[in-house]
């Protein structure tokens, strides 16, 4: 759908990239093949198991299907993977490596082992409602799906008459070196300031460019 909406691309195939994030990767394939090995023996495990379960299989498959011969990369950073992929894709364009990048995230974690793991860590909402920004939030609801955007260098998009839906001004990420899932108490302001500093820098550069 992203390619269809974008229309005819003019960028060289070597300057077209793919950046797709996933939190887990091919966990369904892994569980399936573990059961096969347990029930039927090691020789029945699929030779395609490894390439099917690798997190970077998604961008690789997309690049092969559409002939994108630039970077085909993956971020595997849990729930932030798709957003990180968008930020990294935007950097590929901002730094002059790519003119076009398909970017986003994909996840399909509906297997018994994943469900059991999230259940036992009490990560699921007890009321069955996912509301991450609500003060009364109590967990998430597992789902599967994908979201992909086509990012393009601004001048190239304007020149070919593309319908521009949004502009990414910048992005930043930090680690609070505290806990694998829980945020560090009292440090959110410092981490937010990193993004704000980057955003201000990008805005200044845009204003200078327009003068």
Predicted regions mapped to residue ranges:
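Conserved active-site "lid/cap" helical segment
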Residues: 1-16, 193, 197
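A short acidic, glycine/proline-enriched capping/turn motif at secondary-structure boundaries
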Residues: 2, 18, 23-27
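Conserved catalytic cysteine-centered active-site region
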Residues: 15, 25-88, 97, 117-142, ...
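Short glycine-aspartate micro-motif
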Residues: 15-19, 99-103, 165
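Acidic, glycine-rich active-site loops and adjacent beta-strand->loop/helix elements
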Residues: 22-25, 77-81, 105-110, 170-175
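Short acidic, glycine/serine/threonine-rich loops at helix termini
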Residues: 29-32, 111-117, 178-181
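Condensing-enzyme catalytic core mediating Claisen C-C bond formation in acyl metabolism
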Residues: 128-189, 193
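Positively charged, low-complexity/disordered segments
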Residues: 194-211
């Amino acid at each position: 759908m992203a390619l269809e909406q974008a229309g005819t691309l003019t960028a060289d195939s070597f300057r077209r990239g793919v950046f797709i994030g996933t939190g887990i990767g091919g966990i369904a394939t892994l569980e399936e093949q573990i059961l096969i090995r347990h029930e039927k023996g090691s020789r029945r495990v699929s030779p395609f198991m490894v390439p099917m379960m690798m997190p970077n299989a998604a961008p690789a498959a997309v690049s092969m299907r559409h002939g994108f011969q630039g970077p085909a990369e993956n971020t595997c950073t849990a729930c932030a993977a798709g957003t990180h992929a968008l930020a990294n894709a935007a950097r590929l364009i901002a730094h002059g490596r790519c003119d076009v990048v398909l970017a986003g995230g994909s996840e399909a974690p509906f297997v018994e082992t994943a469900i059991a793991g999230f259940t036992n860590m009490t990560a699921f909402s007890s009321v069955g409602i996912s509301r991450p920004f609500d003060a009364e939030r109590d967990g998430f609801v597992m789902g599967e799906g994908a979201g992909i955007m086509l990012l393009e260098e601004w001048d190239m998009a304007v020149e070919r008459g593309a319908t521009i839906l949004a502009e990414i001004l910048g992005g930043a990420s930090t680690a609070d070196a505290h806990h694998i899932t829980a945020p560090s108490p009292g440090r959110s302001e410092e981490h937010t300031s990193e993004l704000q500093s980057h955003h201000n820098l990008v805005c200044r550069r845009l204003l200078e460019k327009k003068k």
